[in-house]
Amino acid sequence: MNHSPQSARPVSIMRRFLDSEAAGGITLMAAAALALIVANSPFAQTYFDALHLYIGPLSLAHWINDALMAKFFLLVGLEIKREMLDGQLASWPNRMLPGIAAAGGVILPAIIFAVLNHDNPAKLRGWAVPSATDIAFALGVLSLLGSRAPSSLKVFLATLAILDDLAAVVIIAIFYTAEISMPYLGAAFITAAVLFVMNRMGVVKLLPYLISAVILWFFVFNSGVHATVAGVVAALMIPLKPAPGRPDDMTSPLHKLEHTLAKPVAFIVVPIFGFANAGISFKGLEASVLGDTLTLGILLGLFLGKQFGVFGAAWLAIKTGLAEKPMGASWVQLYGVAILCGIGFTMSIFIGLLSFPSDLMQTETKIGVLSGSALSAICGYLLLRAAARPKRG
């Protein structure tokens, strides 16, 4: 009996994807912990000096945040396109629950942050910081439960996080754009148009797309729009099918590039970003920072806003018949996953760096993100572990 690649793909691809994300999450946790240790050790000055070392026109920190992270956003774009066209988000019924839950998880944290910081325009720029979910961290924590967590919950969390990433990309493009240079922006549009034409003409070799993506990054970087947006735009132009008229399979340009990028991004790019940006020196840091509305807005937005926003929106969608509850999952388990959505880290810190130019505000942002993410990870894991425990008697 013959099985098409289409029928064999979902289980094997999702398992491999989840395994990679889980391992990547653990690597990211280790990188963040190491950054905190180094930033409070005798090597702290060397660590901070290295990040501010200029290599060509940019500092090392900027190369990491603007250039290296473009690969992360390229992978995010590939995942979004694959899931929307040929994956868990390919049909409206499948999109409803994670889509509605993701919307709740973006809106409520932003409201909590805005309520606490409404009287300070400088701080209010960070309203989007607690609205993100770190897919590697969250899936890494969920994977610690093994088979005790239904696979439907893992699919729900993965698809919700992908939609969360999509929302974050849109937010970055719209709200965190500097002064626009029209010549560079025009050149970026022309380059994107070239990518689109190549896609429509049936070009399936990756090299022309990758060369055009680098050119697009250069123009977007100089246009004032954040350069990482170039990674997502380029990803959306990569063909999903191996050739015009043929069905999607693992030989398609998109699948090949996604497979090539997955491990380097999970084990090199994101951990380097974590190591470069999670380092907080507690030397001379006043206790009042912990009670500052910026720190509290992010902490409470991630820990409370995310869980109530995601679970509340999901509960409403299920109860009104707009969506179905993940198969085999209890309400308690769904709530546990909603808590895990408060693990913001990568995207939250990234948006924080775009929001605040001052070192103090960036430090407060990182403290809020790290503490909110840690609380969400610990509480979500403990609740899910308790919910999976077999009943006695």
Curated annotation (Swiss-Prot):
Task: Please verify whether the record's keywords include Membrane.
Answer: yes
Its membrane topology: Multi-pass membrane protein
For this protein, the record's Gene3D superfamilies field holds:
Na+/H+ antiporter like domain
Q: Where are the transmembrane segments?
A: 23-43, 58-78, 96-116, 126-146, 155-175, 178-198, 201-221, 224-244, 265-285, 298-318, 334-354, 367-387
The record's annotation in HAMAP family points to: NhaA
Source species, please? Brucella suis (strain ATCC 23445 / NCTC 10510)
The Swiss-Prot or TrEMBL record describes its family as follows:
Belongs to the NhaA Na(+)/H(+) (TC 2.A.33) antiporter family.
Q: Which UniProt keywords apply?
A: Antiport, Cell inner membrane, Cell membrane, Ion transport, Membrane, Sodium, Sodium transport, Transmembrane, Transmembrane helix, Transport
Q: Which GO terms describe its biological process?
A: regulation of pH
**Where, per UniProt, does this protein localize?**
Cell inner membrane
State the Pfam families in the record: Na_H_antiport_1
Reaction catalysed by this enzyme: Na(+)(in) + 2 H(+)(out) = Na(+)(out) + 2 H(+)(in)
Q: What is this protein called?
A: Na(+)/H(+) antiporter NhaA
